[in-house]
Swiss-Prot record:
Organism expressing this protein natively: Hottentotta judaicus
Residues carrying Arginine amide: R64
Pfam family of the protein (one): Toxin_3
More about this protein: Negative results: does not show effects on Nav1.2/SCN2A, and Nav1.3/SCN3A voltage-gated sodium channels. Does not show insecticidal activity. The complete amino acid sequence was obtained by combining proteomic and transcriptomic techniques.
Tissues expressing this chain: Expressed by the venom gland.
UniProt function note: This non-amidated recombinant toxin slows fast inactivation on Nav1.1/SCN1A (EC(50)=52.8 nM), Nav1.4/SN4A (EC(50)=32 nM), Nav1.5/SCN5A (EC(50)=116.7 nM), Nav1.6/SCN8A (EC(50)=46.3 nM), and Nav1.7/SCN9A (EC(50)=147.4 nM) voltage-gated sodium channels. On Nav1.1/SCN1A channel, acts as an agonist by inducing a shift in both the voltage dependence of channel inactivation (alpha-toxin activity) and activation (beta-toxin activity).
Chief location bin: secreted
Superkingdom field: Eukaryota
Name of the protein in its database record: Delta-buthitoxin-Hj2a
Cysteines joined through disulfide linkages: C12-C63, C16-C36, C22-C46, C26-C48
Protein backbone atom coordinates (compact mmCIF):
# COMPACT_ATOMS: atom_id res chain seq x y z
CA UNK A 1 0.00 0.00 0.00
CA UNK A 2 0.92 3.65 -0.17
CA UNK A 3 0.30 6.89 1.70
CA UNK A 4 -1.60 9.25 -0.58
CA UNK A 5 -4.62 11.42 -1.19
CA UNK A 6 -7.46 9.07 -2.05
CA UNK A 7 -9.23 10.16 -5.26
CA UNK A 8 -12.54 9.49 -6.94
CA UNK A 9 -12.91 8.34 -10.56
CA UNK A 10 -12.44 11.94 -11.77
CA UNK A 11 -9.01 12.40 -10.10
CA UNK A 12 -10.53 14.66 -7.45
CA UNK A 13 -9.64 14.45 -3.77
CA UNK A 14 -12.26 13.73 -1.15
CA UNK A 15 -12.91 17.21 0.25
CA UNK A 16 -13.13 17.13 4.02
CA UNK A 17 -13.50 19.04 7.24
CA UNK A 18 -13.25 16.23 9.79
CA UNK A 19 -10.66 13.55 10.41
CA UNK A 20 -13.41 11.05 11.25
CA UNK A 21 -14.90 11.35 7.74
CA UNK A 22 -11.52 10.65 6.12
CA UNK A 23 -10.64 7.84 8.49
CA UNK A 24 -13.94 6.20 7.53
CA UNK A 25 -13.45 6.70 3.76
CA UNK A 26 -9.85 5.48 3.91
CA UNK A 27 -10.44 2.42 6.07
CA UNK A 28 -13.48 1.31 4.07
CA UNK A 29 -11.21 1.35 1.01
CA UNK A 30 -8.67 -0.87 2.80
CA UNK A 31 -6.27 1.71 4.24
CA UNK A 32 -4.83 1.53 7.75
CA UNK A 33 -6.18 4.97 8.67
CA UNK A 34 -6.78 8.42 7.29
CA UNK A 35 -7.13 12.04 8.27
CA UNK A 36 -8.13 15.38 6.78
CA UNK A 37 -5.10 17.26 5.47
CA UNK A 38 -5.92 20.95 5.78
CA UNK A 39 -4.66 23.47 3.23
CA UNK A 40 -2.62 20.88 1.38
CA UNK A 41 -1.64 20.84 -2.27
CA UNK A 42 -5.24 20.12 -3.26
CA UNK A 43 -7.00 22.10 -0.56
CA UNK A 44 -8.62 20.18 2.31
CA UNK A 45 -8.42 16.56 1.21
CA UNK A 46 -8.39 13.11 2.74
CA UNK A 47 -4.94 11.57 3.20
CA UNK A 48 -4.81 7.80 3.65
CA UNK A 49 -2.09 5.69 5.25
CA UNK A 50 -1.19 2.38 3.61
CA UNK A 51 -3.91 2.55 0.95
CA UNK A 52 -4.06 -0.56 -1.28
CA UNK A 53 -2.55 -0.14 -4.76
CA UNK A 54 -5.87 -0.84 -6.47
CA UNK A 55 -7.52 2.26 -5.00
CA UNK A 56 -7.20 5.43 -7.13
CA UNK A 57 -5.08 8.25 -5.74
CA UNK A 58 -4.81 11.90 -6.71
CA UNK A 59 -2.21 12.23 -9.47
CA UNK A 60 -0.86 15.37 -11.17
CA UNK A 61 -3.24 16.91 -13.67
CA UNK A 62 -6.70 18.40 -13.45
CA UNK A 63 -9.53 17.22 -11.30
CA UNK A 64 -12.20 16.55 -13.92
Amino acid sequence: GRDAYIADDKNCVYTCAKNSYCNNECTKNGAESGYCQWLGKYGNGCWCKNLPDKVPIRIPGPCR
